[in-house]
């Protein structure tokens, strides 16, 4: 390859994994793994960012057309959470077909909303589980550890349920599969539901953070 600038990147999982296996990263973690430290760089594998989301599946009437091969998501609602200083920090997706989590993707259970935090305060970390590069590292997302993330996601779920009360939805919606009325009795109950159901949007980033020399957690700079 001939070019002025070459960027070697293994993605948000592969890049920190490769650096750690090469002895570049947090000294204590490398010592725990029995890897010789060549360059201490504490930010490697830290600052794991994602867009935490929860799915709200909804049961529909039998005459509603559920087509597993049709475009499922063609509409998105971007909005700013109440009290947020970050514009459009939340997103709600509506899908015309929903399959059970972890089940057959072609098995229809109804429609669904997906409520997403676009700029979460919380961050996780990536750590090695083996010195074998073929072994998947451990991804600890630490979802919803920050109270502000839980507050915004609670608001998003309640907004989805409010949308379902609109007459246009009531024309074909039977009921909400999850969360249940019991899950909605209090903020604490809803928080427990969130923690049981929060998952990845598969938008991982940040594990080799870019920043200036003054940032001790920066891994690379703009050059």
List the predicted regions and their residue ranges:
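Glycine-rich loop(s) and the adjacent beta-strand/alpha-helix scaffold that form part
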Residues: 1-68, 130-131
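FAD-dependent oxidoreductase catalytic-site/capping-region signature
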Residues: 61-65, 72-223
């Amino acid at each position: 390859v001939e070019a002025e600038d070459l960027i070697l990147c293994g993605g948000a999982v592969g890049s920190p994994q490769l650096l750690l296996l090469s002895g570049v990263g947090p000294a204590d973690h490398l010592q725990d793994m029995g890897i010789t430290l060549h360059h201490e760089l504490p930010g490697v594998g830290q600052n794991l960012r994602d867009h935490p989301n929860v799915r709200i599946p909804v049961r529909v009437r039998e005459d509603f057309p559920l087509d597993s091969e049709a475009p499922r998501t063609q509409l998105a609602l971007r909005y700013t959470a109440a009290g947020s200083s970050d514009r459009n920090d939340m997103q709600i997706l509506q899908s015309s077909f929903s399959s059970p989590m972890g089940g057959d993707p072609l098995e229809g259970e109804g429609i669904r909303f997906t409520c997403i935090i676009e700029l979460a305060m919380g961050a996780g970390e990536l750590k090695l589980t083996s010195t074998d590069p073929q072994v998947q590292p451990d991804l600890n997302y630490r979802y919803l550890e920050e109270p502000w993330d839980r507050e915004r996601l609670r608001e998003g779920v309640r907004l989805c349920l409010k949308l379902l009360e609109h007459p246009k939805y009531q024309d074909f919606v039977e009921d909400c599969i999850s969360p249940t009325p019991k899950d909605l009795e209090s903020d604490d109950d809803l928080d427990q539901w969130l923690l049981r159901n929060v998952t990845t949007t598969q938008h991982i980033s940040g594990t080799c953070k870019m920043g200036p020399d003054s940032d001790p957690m920066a891994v690379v700079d703009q050059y």
